[in-house]
Structures are given as C-alpha cells and as structure tokens.
Amino acid sequence: MKKYDVIIIGTGAANIVLDAALKQGLQCAVIEKGKFGGTCLTRGCIPTKVLATAADYIREIQDLPKIGVEVEPAKMNWDIISRRVWEKIDEHKEVLRHYQKYANLAIYQGSGFFTGEKTLQVKLHDGSLSEEMTAEKIIIDVGARTNLPEISGREATGYICSETLFGDKYPKQPYKSLIIVGGGPIGCEFSHIFAAAGTKVTVVQHNNRLLSKADEDISEQIRQNMEAFGIKTYLNANLLEAKKADDQKTLLFEDRETGERIEVTGEEIMYATGIKPVSKELKIENTSIEMDERGWIKTNEFLETSVNGIWAIGDINGQPAFRHKANYEADILAHNLFGGNEPGKWRWARYDVVPAVTFTYPQVAQVGLTETEAREKGYAVKIGKQFYHNTAKGYALGFTSGDGMDGFVKLIVDGATNNILGVHVIGAQASLLIQPFINMLNMGTVTLKPINEEIGSETAQELRKLGLTRTLDPHSVISVGETMTPHPSLAEVIMWTQYYFEGK
C-alpha cells in the first residue's frame, strides 16, 4: 500500500489545491485520465470562447454599416481559427511538464477508482493496475460528461458533443448544416459559432424556452436574436429517433404542445443536453461517500464529503457547473487545508452569488435570482430595466430602439429593503457589465450557513456551533480574490492582480 499525504483525482481547478500542498512540501499524488488542465482548458470554456470570439467579430462587422463604416463581407478562416483553438488546448502538455518537475509528486495517468473507504487504484493507460494507495487527504475533482439522451438510433447515426468536438471529431471545415439538440448555454453558444461560420443551424430544445435558467425576458430575447441570424429553433420537443441516410442525418421529434411530429435534417447532430456525474467510474459504492439521487457527490459548506478526509469540488458535487465556481472552491480548500489557518479562520462556500455568462451574440450574464424565483420566494419584487440605446455610449455603438442587438439590464429588487436580489444582462460586453454587481452582492458580513447539514467533520460541527461570520471589505484587495469572476472574461485581469499581494 502506497501512502501519500494528499491524493488529488483530476487536474482542473484542483491544481490550485495541489500547488498549495506541494508548496508545503507534502508527498502528493495526482490522478488524471485525460489531458492535464481539466475540462475548461481541453474541451470546454476556453476553446469554445476562441471560436465564439471569431463569431462575435463576424456579427460586429455585419453591424458596422449602422455607424457609417463600410467593409467587405467578413468570413471565417477556419484553418487559422482552428490553429488558435488547438494551440490553446495543447497547453495541457505544458501543464503536465510543469508538474513532472516536482520530486514530491507522483503522477498517475489513467482512471482512478476507490477500492475501499480511503484506498484507490488506477487503471493506467497501458492497461495495468497501479499499486493500491491511500492518503490522509483525498480531493475529488473529476468533472462531469455530456448527458446523452436515450434515443433510438443515436449510436448508429453518430453524433458529436463537446467532448468529441474538441477531439477526433473536430471538423476540418464548418458543417454545411448542423442540428443542435439542447438550448442551454452550450447549445446556444455553438449555434452562434456555427451560424456565424455559415452553417445552417437548427436547435431542438426539450424545454419551453432557451437558456431555461436565465430570466424569462432574456430567454425570449435570445430566441428572437437567434432566429434573426437564421437559426431555426424548436421548443417543447420530445426526441423520438435519429437516423442516417447517405451523408445526411435526420432527427425526429414531437412537439409536446401540438403533438406534431417533425423531422429535421443536417450534416451532423450535436448533443448539448446537459451533464451527468462520473461517480460510477470512481466506484463510489466502495466507500461511504453519500450521493444524491442523480449521482452527484454531496458536500457541505467546507467541501467535505460524508467520509472524513475526502473533499469534492467542481462539477462532481452538483453545485453550479462553472470553472469560476470550481476555482472558488479550490481556493477555499487551499486556504483551509494548506494555508496555515486555524479552523476559526477557515473559509466556507456559498452559492447565492454564482455568476453565469453565456457567450452568444450578444452575450448573456446573470447573478442572483430571476424575477420568477424572487416572486416564488415571497419578495415584494420591484423591477428596473434599461436598454443600451438609451445611453450615450449605446447610441455611439449604433444601438436603436427595436434593434434586436440592443441590450438591456434588468435589476430584481426587494421592494421592502431596496436590496438587489438579481441582475440580468443581455447585450455587448455583458460579461463585464455584470462584474460590479457580483462584487456588490458578495461584499459585507455573511454568517456561516450549513449546506447538507448531515455532513460534517467534528471541526465543521464545532464551527457551525460558533455561528462564524466573515466580512468582505469592499476596500480590501483580499475581497477581490474571494469574489467569483466569470471565466473566461476580461474581468479576470482585475481578479488576478490580487495574486501579486499574496505572493502567488
């Protein structure tokens, strides 16, 4: 049995924790079945935004005549754009080389799984099994994968998803036509990317609106914008069958409202149908780690699982699946476990100020409650709404009333206190406009609120009894680092400056 101080499964946000442990001189092991760097770097938010940025410029150039600038029609050079995508993805090699330099780190490349309460093995890439290992501290950060729908003909027809698109199924040129199943953030972003590249895009969405977790006003506006760009959207769709004939793929679905059966055809089908946990691969059943009914690992406000000495961060714990949220959790663990801080100075996670940004055209950003959520919680809701075109800068940018690209900001306010409950933005640079509200909602004094109260080490239980509070001073640079910043956005430049003061 090999013994380590720390074992980390996954090399996404958990690298923040790993760095802190290595800095302490602890004997560490890291297990990674794929490319180093996690989903975000290798097949998620970063390569997607490289593509989305090119698509943004296509749309912006098309809008330039509104402000008196005439240009030749723009088009994507897919080869150059793709080279930039893969240059970024290939940084995973540098991440691996960086960690190979540490004498106090063992790297296992393969699929890790539990053999007992705190024992692990790895099925290495060559097919062999590693020696069993254990550690005082184990951190799970294994992400999630696409939740493929159960539909007749899916495998025989073939498909792509975010995992395979940035893998062996990356297209040499944009598809002539593409069916995207799913109208959440991933589906909407890829519809923007490929439509701007000249692809005929059809979106088939099970829900009755796009971006179903966004405010309803935002959902409707993004649907109208997508339709204006020639993206056909179908809502309330129950999938029935996928099939292939020659070089075309067909998707059959039923409209739940009308009962009508509809067929759509395209060169490729992409499933962007949410995510599911990978807990089965970890063989969690060999431990006492509690999961919810879907298989997400349950954690408390200190990221502890139901097994002492095992923590879980990132997508696998079932909280909002964003890299900035995972980074936030990793920072908390690094602070609590390896920052030399007594329990009384521990940080804890809160999930009421988790921002979300969707890089469609225009962008969508939100933090806090939607109008519907606020009313359901019993608040005396007041709404403030303002359009870009009503500002001088909005006019300068060419936005006009009734223009589908004209953005707006919507504030959800508690009428009894005038406290902001939620902020929703659709429009140019929404990812930047949302940041001041994230900061505002995160500042002040917050009392520890238990999450999954049945989970808790002795230390966690004692801290709960103390009724700990933590104050984030809006004047302190430390508060910048403890506030989530949407990833990837330019607002991260501001957030990263605080590392200078922490010596990172």
What are these regions (language model features)?
Residues 157-174, 263-343, 436-443, 449-453, ...:
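FAD-site-proximal beta/loop scaffold in flavoenzymes
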Residues 2-4, 19-26, 31-175, 207-211, ...:
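Glycine-rich flavin
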Residues 72, 106-109, 113-126, 197-301, ...:
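A Rossmann-like FAD-binding core segment of flavoenzymes
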Residues 214-217, 221, 313-373, 432, ...:
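A conserved FAD-binding loop/helix module that cradles the flavin
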Residues 45, 142-200, 204, 232-233, ...:
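Glycine-rich dinucleotide-binding loop and its adjacent helix/turn
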Residues 1-12, 174-184:
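Beta1/beta-strand and adjacent pyrophosphate-binding region of the FAD-binding site
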Residues 7-14, 19-34, 46, 50-57, ...:
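Flexible, glycine-rich terminal cap/loop adjacent to redox cofactors
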Residues 7-9, 112, 120, 132-143, ...:
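Short hydrophobic core segments
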